[in-house]
Amino acid sequence: MFKTEPFIEESIEEIRKQIDNRRTIIALSGGVDSSVAAVLADRAIGDKLLAVYVDTGLMRKNESEEIWKIFKEQMGLNLKIVEAKDIFLKELEGVIDPEEKRKIIGRLFIEVFEKVAEEQGEEVLVQGTIAPDWIESEGQIKTHHNIALPGGMVLDVVEPLRELYKDEVRLLAEALGLPDQIAHRQPFPGPGLAVRILGEITDEKLAICKEANFIVSEEIEKTELKNELWQYFAAVLDTKATGVKGDIRDYNWVVALRFVSSLDAMTAHTPEIPFDLIKRISKRITSEIPNVTRVVLDVTDKPPATIEFE
């Protein structure tokens, strides 16, 4: 059985040894993995840590504002938000292949950190990498943005959670006193909404994806399912379908809903979701997002599918 207190003590000591009094930054996303890593690093080295949140433009609706409120205003972290939307979206123009998207995002992600590190005199990068990240990368299922680092990286990497699984990280979050909204927040992919937009990432599809995911989260979080599901989200498919808006034929985008249950993300299954809830989400998406004509439901387990679409 995983014991949190011994791990916390050993991890703090190990972080101190690895960092060796050097100035350090951490990639903070607001998810439970990076949040736990940030708290451990803060306890290990204190004011030598700078938490950096990169707004790639591919994050959830209102994400930057929430990150600032929680981590800066409530938790008092030394936080820097880097606005990098234009950089990421420009490089992703015309890119269709999902692995190419991930590699571009991974490269830019680290380049942004290197730039901040140089400006601030940082030398070490702490990451919230957990076991499924590197296991999947070594198995060549997917390349995770915090594993396939580009050549010539100038920062040393420290990964205090590398051997843990998500359920263990959540236990750590509770033991470290993180708020429930962080400790039990659903996982969000490192590349952000890029892996929930099939085909080319355009401003139109990105806006649809943000709003559709907001609607899904809002509806699920009104129910007990928020404590039972591993992930719940919407993806924008790279296809259009015919619909009717009023008395007029409409030809527009298709959104897929995905709900999965899992313990550690290595396997996952699709549980039964109340049909009236699915219908309510579908109705909201098609009525509140004008350029969506159809909503479909993905019921595929992992394996054979992965949890995210790309």
Curated annotation (Swiss-Prot):
It catalyses: XMP + L-glutamine + ATP + H2O = GMP + L-glutamate + AMP + diphosphate + 2 H(+). ATP binds at residues 29-35. GO terms for cellular component: cytosol. It is an enzyme of class 6 (ligase). Pathway: Purine metabolism; GMP biosynthesis; GMP from XMP (L-Gln route): step 1/1. Its EC number is 6.3.5.2. Residues 2-185 form the GMPS ATP-PPase domain. The keyword Nucleotide-binding applies. It comes from the Archaea. InterPro entries: GMP_synth_C (IPR001674), GMP_synthase_B (IPR026598), GMPS_ATP_PPase_dom (IPR025777), NAD/GMP_synthase (IPR022310), Rossmann-like_a/b/a_fold (IPR014729). One of its GO terms (molecular function) is ATP binding. PROSITE patterns: GMPS_ATP_PPASE. CDD domains: GMP_synthase_C (cd01997). Pfam families: GMP_synt_C, NAD_synthase. Keywords: ATP-binding, GMP biosynthesis, Ligase, Nucleotide-binding, Purine biosynthesis. Catalyzes the synthesis of GMP from XMP. Heterodimer composed of a glutamine amidotransferase subunit (A) and a GMP-binding subunit (B). This is GMP synthase [glutamine-hydrolyzing] subunit B. It comes from Methanococcus maripaludis (strain C7 / ATCC BAA-1331). The gene is guaAB.
